[in-house]
Regions:
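Generic structural motif recognizing short loop/turn segments at the entrances and edges of beta-strands
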Residues: 2-3, 12-13, 227-229, 244, ...
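Glycine/tryptophan-enriched, flexible segments
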Residues: 12-150, 253-299
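Short alpha-helical segments and helix-capping/turn motifs at coil-helix boundaries
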Residues: 1-3, 82, 249-253
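Active-site-proximal binding-pocket segments
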Residues: 91-265
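Active-site neighborhoods of enzyme catalytic cores
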Residues: 1-22, 236
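Short clusters of hydrophobic/aromatic residues that line enzyme substrate/ligand-binding pockets
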Residues: 7, 17, 80, 155, ...
């Protein structure tokens, strides 16, 4: 849907996902999702007579990293709610890259996922559009917290700790595995994105904008609206965000979503050896420090 198609009755934008998604689904049920017949535009194309700018003139380098293989079938949709949070399982579609560049139709994905009894996959597509309309209506959120009071947070922004996070050397296995996957493949499992982002903002007290920028430089499926929306969600300063006192415990997250350490061992070759780094911060102390900083900012 376009930016003004799914709004409140008074024409203002939704800033909470649940009522937005309900209105979105109402609109969907009343509207037949049709494909745009792009072939009709072929007759309107024109051949340029003058030489166009060569792509080599831009500061663009070819990557040797192969994008993740698309995994979109009925089983992925049906089992998405069950499998989407387990990084060792190939339970996500990997379609983010194609949605970003328009090589897959959002309409075809909506039609296919809407046929399933399990709507979890469809809800994720709605989240994508929710963040898009937020960025449209509130463009200042590219660099500012949606909730302005969170601008008062006194970030530590320790660059040595930031570099350890970037390199996957924090001493927290699930965090390090995620960052190493990102650096090597240009992709990171969504559950692990939340864990790594939360760790940067809450454990290290590093400004979400710094982490968002790093993800933007690495992710093949980077979309500004989703990236900013999710980083602000994790930091607690965005629309419909997690409360600031929700701080992921990396060890509990690993126990829950990578109990057998399959994902961790895949990306950390030196795991469980003396070569693996010590924790750069104590979880309990980091949690207490974070809560204090946030309370001071919002009080």
């Amino acid at each position: 849907f376009e930016e003004r198609e799914v709004v409140k009755n008074d024409g203002t934008p939704y800033v909470v996902y649940t009522p937005y998604s309900k209105k979105w689904m109402e609109k969907l049920s009343k509207k037949d999702v049709k494909h745009f017949k792009s072939e009709a535009f072929l007759s309107k194309t024109k051949k340029l007579k003058k030489q166009t700018t060569n792509i080599k003139t831009f500061d663009i380098n070819e990557s040797n990293i192969k994008p993740p293989k698309v995994n979109f079938n009925n089983d992925v949709i049906k089992n998405y709610e069950r499998d989407r949070n387990t990084p060792e399982i190939d339970g996500t579609s990997k379609l983010g890259l194609h949605l970003r560049f328009g090589t897959k139709s959002i309409r075809s994905l909506v039609k296919k996922s809407n046929l399933s009894q399990n709507k979890t996959f469809l809800k994720e597509l709605i989240w994508r559009e929710f963040f898009m309309q937020i960025l449209w209506h509130f463009p200042e959120t590219t660099t500012q917290c949606f909730k302005s009071k969170y601008e008062k947070i006194k970030w530590r922004n320790n660059m040595d700790e930031f570099n350890a996070w970037c390199e996957g050397k924090t001493g927290y296995p699930i965090v390090d595995a995620g960052m190493r996957e990102l650096n090597k493949t240009g992709f990171m499992h969504n559950r692990v994105r939340m864990i790594t982002a939360s760790f940067l903002c809450k454990h290290l007290l590093i400004d979400w904008r710094i982490g968002e920028k790093y993800f933007a430089s690495k992710l093949f499926d980077y979309e500004q609206s989703s990236n900013i929306g999710n980083w602000q969600w994790v930091a607690g300063c965005g629309v419909d965000a997690a409360p600031y006192f929700r701080i992921f415990n990396p060890y509990e997250q690993q126990k829950k979503f990578d109990k057998e350490k399959v994902y961790v061992k895949k990306w950390i070759s030196e795991y469980d050896t003396t070569k693996y780094p010590q924790e750069i911060v104590n979880h309990k102390l980091a949690r207490e420090r974070c809560l204090k900083a946030y309370k001071e900012a919002v009080s």
